[in-house]
Structure formats: structure tokens, C-alpha cells
């Protein structure tokens, strides 16, 4: 048993605790309260006092691509054209060896740990790279084996067999901390027949799914009209595209994919009707505001998602499109852009965005019975954020100090399942 104390403890599911503490017993949280209370309850337990800091649940980055960490900045010259960005990404990826990709994934995982992330929802063409990286760094997460470019219904059965084989091989490597799922990339890169096969398999075998959906205007145009930049993918490979004449969310519902309760990444171009369908099917959303903005895709209606009762978590996306994995920075950007939307009557609070970055992400990945809040019996996944920087004080409200005056460089310590996986030089 060890007690971690700080000026502020944020359980997330209850009010902040001043002069608070968290008792950690093995891999779990034993108790949360004031330091005085926990000292009385556990008089023989050592105390680690982090001082001017906040202890909160570890951040859950529910949408990332760790295996392309080495492409940070390499695609910035084409990000004004999403189709060109995707083509260049695949070209550069083809030049990397397996060793390169595995090393990139480890670097990305370590960056996340140093930023207070304790859990990832990571997507990879080489799923084993992300899985090995999370294991090596000591992180928790779900690694989603991604499809290749597979829009041709004529090859759907073969494409599915290859994907299922990769998934089943990956599943043999699951641990208590790292689990696996599937990621049919998007409505514009995966054929309808393959989507149906994956959905049937996921329901039968209880496989978690994540999908890029309604990310860009190009995607919505392709599905609604059968035209636009993404039609070029089909023309390039001499493939036929029969437009379903609907939104991406309606399309996924028609194919039975929404009934698998997938985690939908981005959802920039969604209507009130789309959100209603997402909620009704129990699907979730990974909100990636910085990546969306960097591409110029638009503002995802974050506040409308919350008002609709949809489960929402935060994602950094890859550092090839965002450049950093910093959930504090992502939180700040999410709050500011939501507040600044024209016609928005919803004022997102710092408390709401911290809940989204922790418990929201845990719910989005289906892990909220284990992580996402500091409660007795839950896993001891936590981060300690220093509040001693001159630019952070005075601390009038700990939520606003964290969201609007802190970033990943203020992370002092990160713990997963009771094991410290990162400690800053200042904290050492």
C-alpha cells in the first residue's frame, strides 16, 4: 500500500478534494480522500507527497496511430488536400521496414506516457507494432487491426479472411492491459460487402470496432453524390462506386455496422439526425479537434454530441496530422473551439472537458468499469500534473488551471495499474 498526495485530487465522478490523496494497493485504488483521512486509515503506509500538483485519472487517448509517429511533419506540405495527404502517407509507409514501424510505435507510446496518457485506442495496419509498443511502455489500451485499402466487393471474402487471420493472431497476444479489436478504415476505403462481413464477425465474437466516419467534406460528397476528390481513388484503380445517396452515418447504419456499437472517429460532418442514430445504436465518438482543424475539415459539433447524450472521448489522431500527443492541449482546443462556434448556445466547461478526456474516453473504449475515474476498486491508472509553474497560478479553480494553463510539459508522473511508467526530471 502506498499513498499519493497532492494539493488537489480530481476523482472526476465527485468534487475535487483539497489536500487530497489516493491510496494505491497493488494495481488498484484502495481509497480516495483527504491526506489526513488516509493517514488515519493506513497509518503504516508510506506517503508520496507531490505537493503543488493535481492527481487525476490518466488521460485516455481514444484515437491514435502510433505506428506512423516517425512521419511527424513529413506530410504537412500536402495537408491542404486530404486525398494527396492519404496517398503520400501510404507511399511513405511503404518505404518503412517492420523495424522502423515498431520503433515509431514505441516512440509514440512513450510520448503519450510522458503526456499523462495511460490508455490508448490505437489503430494500425501493423497491429502487432502498436500492441508491442503499449506492452513495452507499460500502457493500457485496445489495439485495432486496420483494414488495407479494400473497396472492391469482388474481393471482400478474401479481404475479410486476411483481416480475420491478422486479428486472431493478434488476439493470442492480449494481456490484462492490452486488448485487440478491428478497424474497417472508413466508408470510402472499405467496400459495403466487407463492412457487412466485419459487422457480422464483430457481433458474433464481441469484437470492438473503430471507424473513421464523417471526417471530411470529400467523404460526405462521395457518399451523397458519388463525386469529388475521393472518387479519384476509384477512378485510379478502375473500380466502380455506387453512391448510397446518404450520410456516412446513415450508410453505416444501413450496413448493420452501427449496431456493433463502434467507436466513430472524427464525426465532423454529422447532423442532429446522425447524432440521434449514433445515440440510438450505442455507438461512441472519438473527438479529434486539433487534427480536424489542421486539415481544415471543420468544427465537429462537440457540444451537440454531449447534448444528444452520445458518449464522447478525446483523441489526438496521429502525430502525422496533429504533430503532438498532448491531451491537455487537445482538451483546451476542444473547449475553446466549442465555445467559439457560431450559433452555439452551449458553454463547455473545463470540468466537462476533463471528464471527456478521462471517463469519457474510458466509456468510449468500453473500459469505464476499470478506469476513467479515481474510485475504490478501479485500476490505479493516474497522472500527476504539476501546478507550480508561474503561468499556472494562483489556482482559483483547479479545472481551469489544468485545461487553460497547463500542457504535457507539466506532467510529473504517470501510473498504470499501480506501476509508475513515467516520472519527469523535476519530480525525480
What are these regions (language model features)?
Residues 70-103, 137, 142-152, 216-261, ...:
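Active-site gating loops and adjacent loop-to-helix segments of metal-dependent hydrolytic enzymes
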